[in-house]
Amino acid sequence: MSQLEHNIGLSIFEPVAKHRANRIVCTIGPSTQSVEALKNLMKSGMSVARMNFSHGSHEYHQTTINNVRAAAAELGLHIGIALDTKGPEIRTGLFKDGEVSFAPGDIVCVTTDPAYEKVGTKEKFYIDYPQLTNAVRPGGSIYVDDGVMTLRVVSKEDDRTLKCHVNNHHRLTDRRGINLPGCEVDLPAVSEKDRKDLEFGVAQGVDMIFASFIRTAEQVREVRAALGEKGKDILIISKIENHQGVQNIDSIIEASNGIMVARGDLGVEIPAEKVCVAQMCIISKCNVVGKPVICATQMLESMTSNPRPTRAEVSDVANAVLNGADCVMLSGETAKGKYPNEVVQYMARICVEAQSATHDTVMFNSIKNLQKIPMCPEEAVCSSAVASAFEVQAKAMLVLSNTGRSARLISKYRPNCPIICVTTRLQTCRQLNVTRSVVSVFYDAAKSGEDKDKEKRVKLGLDFAKKEKYASTGDVVVVVHADHSVKGYPNQTRLIYLP
């Protein structure tokens, strides 16, 4: 059946899927930092708690981490914790009077001369990027205050100064963000603040880093180096926020554990109408190689202050699911919004509805046809297990995986049922929260040797499937696990009728 034939058969009157494949990342802020508020978010559908290190002190984020863990423990859940770095930024300096108003047609000079750092005026103000005059040529644009104010460069006055034409009305205040669309920007991946934040994250045992403004694969490696030996198991999710990141996406994906399509800054750095193209391309590339991908920014933004989303926002979330995103993310909606629980519940419902419109077998065949032959044995086993799940219409898949690699490989091939991963590592439980369809179950391996506890772990997973109503007595569950007499990869697939 083609995608078009599948779409024709869709009906709003059919029951929706019993499980939600897509995961939800929630930004934690004043509206949701308490243990009780976090418990409500978790009950509503939060999988990963995001801390935005552009704001707040280490003490503030320490409280968030403690509260997330306390709330998760009370509910018996394994919630991932993500540290989102501030990243390298370009900003204006200070203004002599605190703010300046501009009108269309005004002429202003921008300078990298430190003498103007704290005494900006309507005629001249400071930008803290020393290479500014080399990066932007006459005719180019400078976006100020996250793109709200635009300047067109008229001429280069000297090695530190550009004369610019103001394109629109705006009241500009201190330390506003600068974007240089289409320009090659040379900034370090890890600022001094980022380095301290990463050290804090390692000490606190966060599960993943959302690395901001990644432009090259080398910058991903810089973040990995900053995490050090103690942080070697932390996932790095690279945020794509500018044209350089899009241009270098293949090597960035290879160097990263996952990708975030951060559409806010991306929509400033490239034309807004091209963001949907970048989003679909990046998500598809991640799908082909089996790396988790998050779609973020302005997804249900109106619910920061309104109890219901706009129809366009609903379509946006659904489109991210249809594109193939593993996760969708909420920012201010949960950090400072009036309706944090409602927005997560709404997003969860949208994701489930959008699942019905995805043609899973088409996705499976497309991904498999794009793989290089010969496959590695582990991937061959996992892809064959997914094929079996489609053929027998399995209600669930069960995988025994300590690192989560096998669970991710199974997820890569997009089965249309939940993937229950029984693991002996709590960190694996939390990190798999960014992987589509995977639900983790922790097994305490200290009770017995690994060879002896295999069937106990299988039973634990089957009992969990029944308890959570993923499957019922008589339903088929596809089980994937290793035979420890043959080392190296999970080489057994079993079809079990749930007792």
Curated annotation (Swiss-Prot):
Binding site for K(+): N52, S54, D84, T85
Chain residues that bind substrate: R50, G264, D265, T297
Binding annotation for ATP: N52, F53, S54, H55, R91
Site (Transition state stabilizer): residue numbering on this chain: K239
GO terms assigned for molecular function: ATP binding; kinase activity; magnesium ion binding; potassium ion binding; pyruvate kinase activity
Residues binding Mg(2+): E241, D265
Activation and inhibition: Activated by fructose 2,6-bisphosphate, activated by the effector in a cooperative manner.
Family: Belongs to the pyruvate kinase family.
Entries under NCBIfam families matching the protein: PRK05826.1, PRK06354.1, pyruv_kin
Protein name (database record): Pyruvate kinase 1
Gene: PYK1
